[in-house]
Amino acid sequence: MKLSKYIDHTLLKPQATEKDILKLIEEAKTYDFASVCVNPSWVKLAYENLKDTDVKVCTVVGFPLGATSTASKVYETKVAIEDGADEIDMVISVGQLKSGNDEYVKEEIKKIVEASKNKLVKVIIETCLLTEEEKVKACTLSKEAGADYVKTSTGFSTGGAKPEDIKLMRETVGKDMGVKASGGIHTKEEMEAMIENGATRIGASCGVQLVR
């Protein structure tokens, strides 16, 4: 697979304007990225500009804290799908996971998978806030709940993707689930290190410089 198809070309800054989003979309078309990842309010715009291409529209749910209610996340998911999203990157309830409330975490993911109507669901586990044991648990629960990917980070917390986390996540979920590295990937060497350790998707705001 060519490098560009690993990349979710991402712009999630709250101050991003319509002009910024349109630039992101044009870059995704030019470089043939896997998707653009935008906030929910921009999904319709992305869909309208990408519907005749093979670039997917990805958006975020429960972002960036993961601390909204399950009902809110489900509603966000349904609206995003109606607006044209192909992929949902949801944030787990980190606090519920760290409290040992495994069933809450698993059921929430399951409900979002159901609401996504067979669109791709990626579960952001926010590795920088978790112990090794919690990372394994988050990945296991995500797989059991039927998600398509586990993802390292929002890019809005205390740290981003690390090769060793990707390796652990890949070992935990096995070969038949996607692993997405995101947060702090700025060079081709960093991206290749993630892929070598098992990443099948890369979230990056600097996708163009990664493939040039």
From Swiss-Prot:
Query: Which catalytic reaction applies to this protein?
Result: 2-deoxy-D-ribose 5-phosphate = D-glyceraldehyde 3-phosphate + acetaldehyde
What are the recorded GO MF terms, alphabetically? deoxyribose-phosphate aldolase activity
Location (main, coarse): cytoplasm
> For this protein, what is the EC number?
4.1.2.4
One GO process term, biological-process aspect: deoxyribonucleotide catabolic process
> Where found, per UniProt?
Cytoplasm
SMART domains with a match to the protein in the record = DeoC
- GO cellular component labels: cytoplasm
Could you name the active-site residues?
D89 (proton donor/acceptor), K151 (schiff-base intermediate with acetaldehyde), K180 (proton donor/acceptor)
Q: Which UniProt keywords apply?
A: Cytoplasm, Lyase, Schiff base
One Pfam family it belongs to: DeoC
Q: Report the pathway entry.
A: Carbohydrate degradation; 2-deoxy-D-ribose 1-phosphate degradation; D-glyceraldehyde 3-phosphate and acetaldehyde from 2-deoxy-alpha-D-ribose 1-phosphate: step 2/2
Q: Which family does it belong to?
A: Belongs to the DeoC/FbaB aldolase family. DeoC type 1 subfamily.
Any idea what job this protein has? Catalyzes a reversible aldol reaction between acetaldehyde and D-glyceraldehyde 3-phosphate to generate 2-deoxy-D-ribose 5-phosphate.
> What is the protein name stated in its UniProt record?
Deoxyribose-phosphate aldolase
Could you tell me which species this protein originates from?
Answer: Clostridium botulinum (strain Langeland / NCTC 10281 / Type F)
What is the gene called? deoC
